[in-house]
Amino acid sequence: MEEDLFQLRQLPVVKFRRTGESARSEDDTASGEHEVQIEGVHVGLEAVELDDGAAVPKEFANPTDDTFMVEDAVEAIGFGKFQWKLSVLTGLAWMADAMEMMILSILAPQLHCEWRLPSWQVALLTSVVFVGMMSSSTLWGNISDQYGRKTGLKISVLWTLYYGILSAFAPVYSWILVLRGLVGFGIGGVPQSVTLYAEFLPMKARAKCILLIEVFWAIGTVFEVVLAVFVMPSLGWRWLLILSAVPLLLFAVLCFWLPESARYDVLSGNQEKAIATLKRIATENGAPMPLGKLIISRQEDRGKMRDLFTPHFRWTTLLLWFIWFSNAFSYYGLVLLTTELFQAGDVCGISSRKKAVEAKCSLACEYLSEEDYMDLLWTTLSEFPGVLVTLWIIDRLGRKKTMALCFVIFSFCSLLLFICVGRNVLTLLLFIARAFISGGFQAAYVYTPEVYPTATRALGLGTCSGMARVGALITPFIAQVMLESSVYLTLAVYSGCCLLAALASCFLPIETKGRGLQESSHREWGQEMVGRGMHGAGVTRSNSGSQE
């Protein structure tokens, strides 16, 4: 009966890449390949027809064809001149985002004094920015998944630039409240630059490159403080708002150089455009393109919220939402607390200052002094060691443990602030706390694009960013309003939140260290091959000895 089916001779070895595609190349020694054999059987296969005569679907094409996926092309082309240019351009977007965020801690006390605003209106001025970011983050993610990463990013940057400059001309409080809210709406799309950036990076360089992009965030925060030192005393806050939009203007001019993500193009069926993009990158990097045919991924609905809550991603999504919430809640809370603590001298000084203020005037205020700006600059510089520490540990401990460690150290530093310490020790504790909470934020930006597939990557990052904005929305009322009632309760809230976030990081079901980016919502490419004739008897074995 076996002779009726086929004559046993020799079974040619087929090499399957981790992404699912395959090739006949015998000298292909790339890591992650496995030889698949049937023990004890040597077969010469003859062509057979399907019983029903149906054609094999395109996505189930013959795995012995010379084919490659975008992941293979990105890995083969490697990191080069193109990625360096993209790093600088993406970094400009991050620098602009950081400056718009940092300006809140500088603008709030200035307007508090200049316009005689009560504390709740000062807090609302900060919160309205985060309301805009929260309401738009998911929208920008959906636009990026539906219409392309470049499209979503370009529109959001132009939007932010326009309303950022307009807000400098606000005549009264209500106007600046509305305009800064619209600025926040645009900033909600800036994190999509990470989605675009990550999809052009080879696996080994991805974590390091995304973390190094965060250096631009640190540069942005430091530059904003330095700019405020020189601009605020002479030109005032309006010029500070205008000059803070310069990085956005540069990005808006240069963003037309950006290509669309090849992964997005393949997923949306634009094979020719994806190949053209990959050839452009290969030319700029001076690297060869892989031989063979680019596989077109099975076209799926993109940017659907329900895909974030499939059984495979449900817990990941919920835990990530809380992690991002805690990151932003604690990070921006610390930024706002820093100016309050420096003005008071220490934690105990806030209580004594509160009594003096109440006796004098409910609208009493203090402008930031030169000493306050310098100490603010020192704590802002902590962003740089935060990047370096995270860069060193993220590929050693993994993404989950890195986030957990950062949350724990921030929580510990927050508890130490309960002690009435001098200004120097206060600055040191704030420096360490900010370094590690920014490191946790950076690790989350590495993990999130890695854990979601291309079809929902932008939406996943967008919803996480939206939850971060919820935390940032709430934090002014803790760091600026609750602080007046109880300093210790305020610090306890931040410390407790980060301890819970550390636990959430440990319970994330997927560790993405060493994983390639997924193209499909299917966990493994082999699941897309279900239905294809693979009925050979025997045991499947890989060179590594593990079953695939």
Swiss-Prot record:
MF-aspect GO terms: transmembrane transporter activity
Sites of Phosphoserine modification: 25, 31, 542
Entry protein name: Synaptic vesicle 2-related protein
InterPro entries hit by this protein: MFS, MFS_dom, MFS_sugar_transport-like, MFS_trans_sf, Orgcat_transp/SVOP, SVOP-like_MFS_dom
Cytoplasmic topological intervals: 1-87, 144-156, 202-209, 260-316, 395-401, 446-457, 511-548
Protein family per UniProt: Belongs to the major facilitator superfamily.
GO biological process: xenobiotic transport
Residue ranges that the UniProt entry lists as topological domain Vesicular: 109-122, 178-180, 231-238, 338-373, 423-424, 479-489
Spans traversing the lipid bilayer: 88-108, 123-143, 157-177, 181-201, 210-230, 239-259, 317-337, 374-394, 402-422, 425-445, 458-478, 490-510
GO CC aspect terms: basal plasma membrane; synaptic vesicle; synaptic vesicle membrane
Gene this protein is translated from: SVOP
Ribonucleoprotein recorded as keyword: no
Localization, UniProt: Cytoplasmic vesicle, Secretory vesicle, Synaptic vesicle membrane
Organism this protein belongs to: Homo sapiens
Keyword Metal-binding: no
Membrane topology category: Multi-pass membrane protein
UniProt entry keywords in alphabetical sequence: Cytoplasmic vesicle, Membrane, Phosphoprotein, Synapse, Transmembrane, Transmembrane helix, Transport
Record-linked CDD domains: MFS_SVOP
